[in-house]
Amino acid sequence: MARGVNKVILVGTCGQDPEVRYLPNGNAVTNLSLATSEQWTDKQTGQKVERTEWHRVSLFGKVAEIAGEYLRKGSQCYIEGKLQTREWEKDGIKRYTTEIIVDMQGTMQLLGGRPQNQQQGGDPYNQGGSNQQPRQQAPRQQRPQQPPAPQQPAQPAADFDSFDDDIPFMDPYRFNWHLQ
């Protein structure tokens, strides 16, 4: 029997550009802040109320590199990971933080298009290098024009009434059920 399930699924918006760093063994670690919001109507006032929750997300390995390269402030993404609480001591006071860990068992998927604050003319995504360097925008390439495809003649709609096959299910009343 399983001892428990530790699984978190979030769909949210990045609150800042991700921070990428590399461990001594060369593995990437990316930290980001993800916002999720819920909305409801207050029964007493009739006003719409919105609450935003901020989540700390740490990604490891290849998914961390991808997040660091493609996610930006305002990007929407799907995160699937696990909760983990860390403890440390600072100035004699124990401190705790709970974060979502996305490692080899987790998932990160980019959603939607480019963030709304990006300009139309350039490529908003980092072309490599570290996050400390300024990002350069690559010139936008246009697709070659293709001639329109010739139109195909319309095909008649399928006639589903002409099927005379029997329904491929067994009749449950044909069998003797021996239940004891």
UniProtKB/Swiss-Prot annotation:
It holds the Pfam family SSB. PROSITE patterns: SSB (PS50935). Residues 111-180 are annotated as: Disordered. The keyword Cytoplasm does not apply. Residues 5-109 form the SSB domain. It comes from the Bacteria. Keywords: DNA-binding, Plasmid. SUPFAM superfamilies: Nucleic acid-binding proteins. Homotetramer. This is Single-stranded DNA-binding protein. It comes from Pseudomonas putida. The gene is ssb.
